[in-house]
Amino acid sequence: MEGNGQDMYVAGEERFGFFTSHGYSLSRIIPTFRRFYTFVINDITNQKFSRIMDIGSGNGYVLAQVISQNSNATGYGIDPSPYMVRIGSRRARRMGISARVTFMMGSSHEIPTKGKFDIIYSTMSFHHWSNREKAVTDIMQLLDDNGKFMIYEASPRGGFNRKLVKAHLMDREDFILLSKKTGVPIAEIVENGGFIRATFVNR
């Protein structure tokens, strides 16, 4: 389902409108972002899954790449921006994977699909979310047994990252504190070249 022009952001979240949504595709010309996307895509494709969701899927680049490399998987991308949803849907059609990938309006506080997932993930989106603690506990309910919620962010380590606004960075201590607040244990934290991935598993 493509967006109808109404966004689903809540107060305090960074909004992506028409121009910023289309301009975001240019981020891949920046070497640091290319390395980040490569890290995420390689990391996810090395996991076992048949049903996967991207929360804050943006222009759909990561999810489309992941699904194109796993012919047995279906993917769902949700984003609060109708413009991002349209861009992701067009990308899936161009790549010939629209039968296995669905982009729709949604957000961390309003997930519009039913059923369980093997993996739910977010990429450089989690730091935008309002009420992260509630979002994490809600997301864990959508995972199959041993399903994973994987959060990918930029960390303060690395020269480029230190130039970013601090609010856009997350480190190991942020995720440890999140685990304590939610009571959801962290299965793994991986740091790689200025990027970080925290994994929560539904035991």
Set out the residue ranges of the language-model regions:
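C-terminal alpha-helical "lid/dimerization" subdomain adjacent to the S-adenosyl-L-methionine
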Residues: 27, 150-199
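A conserved beta-strand element that flanks and buttresses the S-adenosyl-L-methionine
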Residues: 121
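A short glycine-rich, Lys/Arg-flanked "PGG" loop and its adjoining helix->strand segment in the class I
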Residues: 134-145
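Conserved alpha-helix/loop element of class I SAM-dependent methyltransferases that forms part
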Residues: 31-48
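Class I SAM-dependent methyltransferase Rossmann-like catalytic core
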Residues: 18-32
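Class I SAM-dependent methyltransferase SAM/SAH-binding core
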Residues: 53-55, 59-108
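Short conserved loop adjoining the S-adenosyl-L-methionine
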Residues: 110-114
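N-terminal, positively charged/glycine-rich alpha-helical extensions of SAM-dependent methyltransferases
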Residues: 1-21
